[in-house]
Amino acid sequence: MFRTLMNAKIHRARVTEANLNYVGSITIDADILDAVGMVPNEKVQIVNNNNGARFETYIIPGERGSGVFCLNGAAARLVQKGDIIIVISYAIVPEEKIAQHRPKIAIMDENNRIQQLIVEEPAHTVL
């Protein structure tokens, strides 16, 4: 049996731009992608903390060190510049590997810099 588990999460990032006239996707600072192990073209779930919207798209790497989180295409209708979002990637893990699976979580500051990098989400944590 296989299970779908959270593989990586970018928590409390601020939307820097919403570009309706782009083909689609989310552009994310490549340094942040590297830190959590997300890759270009990876399918991700976006959760908008401001309005409760949840949707899926794929990643485009952005300029390193820029702090960019730009929602492109139709997804731009679901966010506004300044909204707080969570970006989540998932992995399909065989049952026998679940105990060894360790997701990475980047907690972002107000400038989209990694404030804390956590391996495996702690239980009962309020962030």
Swiss-Prot record:
Gene Ontology molecular function: aspartate 1-decarboxylase activity
InterPro entries attached to this UniProt entry: Asp_de-COase-like_dom_sf (IPR009010), Asp_decarbox (IPR003190)
Catalytic reaction(s) noted: L-aspartate + H(+) = beta-alanine + CO2
Top EC class, one word: lyase
GO biological process: alanine biosynthetic process; pantothenate biosynthetic process
Pathway: Cofactor biosynthesis; (R)-pantothenate biosynthesis; beta-alanine from L-aspartate: step 1/1
Residues annotated as binding substrate: T57, G73, A74, A75
Superkingdom field: Bacteria
GO cellular component: cytosol
Presence of the UniProt keyword Transcription in the record: no
Subcellular locations according to the entry: Cytoplasm
Positions of the catalytic residues: S25 (schiff-base intermediate with substrate), Y58 (proton donor)
Role summary: Catalyzes the pyruvoyl-dependent decarboxylation of aspartate to produce beta-alanine.
Quaternary structure annotation from Swiss-Prot or TrEMBL: Heterooctamer of four alpha and four beta subunits.
Family: Belongs to the PanD family.
Name under which the protein is recorded: Aspartate 1-decarboxylase
Organism: Geobacillus sp. (strain WCH70)
